[in-house]
Amino acid sequence: MFIKLDGTKLSQKLKEDLAKKVNNQKIKILIIISDPSEASRIYVRNKINYCDSLGIQTEVYDLSKIDDTNQFIVEMNQKISLSNPNGVLVQLPIKERLDTNKIIENIPIRLDVDAFLYHRFDQDQKEKVIPCVLNAVLELFKEYQLSFLDKKILLIGNGITSNQPIVNYLNEHQIKFDLITKENSQLLEEKTKVADLVISAVGKAKFLANYQFKRGVIFIDIGIDKYFDPEQSKYLICGDFDYDKLKEIASYGTPTPGGIGPLTIYSLVKNLINLSEIQKVNK
């Protein structure tokens, strides 16, 4: 029997704990935008709405007109000094002409809500501020009593905010896995047939629809895209997997939307609250 890994339902449950932690505290997040696309603005709006519902202050700073990396960093840091937030979110993607890694490396560690710089955190911050997608997956596994152990694990894609933190986690815990990227994509077809757990972060609509998976597979869909549905004459949100098709043979899986997405926003705000608490202790 297939069980839907319901990220929306779980995030609503976990949100109650966040509300208790906030408890009328003054907490503020600064969101910096580089990409002017509608998709980025939707992502930002969802995060703002979530923060608003908890009484967390948000400020958006639009740097989408800047095409020089050094100027971007200077203006970002000037705004951080003026705004005095508890956390900073640089919304990805960053425009291609800018150096994403250099910008991320210049986010103050004490304000890094996405945990991009997790490798530079001290031990206390590492325990309390976890990369958002990784935490989303761990929360789902905890709720549905799933595990990485004793499984053939297949990761597809390794973006900085998606599968890369999961790669790091599995390596730290000495858990074996296969990773498919552009460099070895010719292996994808044979790997999907034998994997017990597949986590995909490609971001192409139903990218895996025509691949074969084993019966009982667990699938986690981090990718998000849209496709045109001629029957409804409109675009619909979807992930890398064909959810309706795969759930016929899978044991567990995440829908898109409603799977990983809501839990990444929860994880972001959880990190923000924990950063605020760390800052109070270190004052």
From Swiss-Prot:
Its EC number is 1.5.1.5, 3.5.4.9. The keyword NADP applies. One of its GO terms (molecular function) is methenyltetrahydrofolate cyclohydrolase activity. It catalyses: (6R)-5,10-methylene-5,6,7,8-tetrahydrofolate + NADP(+) = (6R)-5,10-methenyltetrahydrofolate + NADPH; (6R)-5,10-methenyltetrahydrofolate + H2O = (6R)-10-formyltetrahydrofolate + H(+). Pathway: One-carbon metabolism; tetrahydrofolate interconversion. NADP(+) binds at G157, N158, G159, I224. InterPro entries: Aminoacid_DH-like_N_sf, NAD(P)-bd_dom_sf, THF_DH/CycHdrlase, THF_DH/CycHdrlase_cat_dom, THF_DH/CycHdrlase_NAD-bd_dom. GO terms for cellular component: cytosol. Gene3D superfamilies: Leucine Dehydrogenase, chain A, domain 1 (3.40.50.10860), NAD(P)-binding Rossmann-like Domain (3.40.50.720). GO terms for biological process: L-histidine biosynthetic process; methionine biosynthetic process; purine nucleotide biosynthetic process; tetrahydrofolate interconversion. Keywords: Amino-acid biosynthesis, Histidine biosynthesis, Hydrolase, Methionine biosynthesis, Multifunctional enzyme, NADP, One-carbon metabolism, Oxidoreductase, Purine biosynthesis. HAMAP family: THF_DHG_CYH. Belongs to the tetrahydrofolate dehydrogenase/cyclohydrolase family. Catalyzes the oxidation of 5,10-methylenetetrahydrofolate to 5,10-methenyltetrahydrofolate and then the hydrolysis of 5,10-methenyltetrahydrofolate to 10-formyltetrahydrofolate. Homodimer. This is Bifunctional protein FolD.
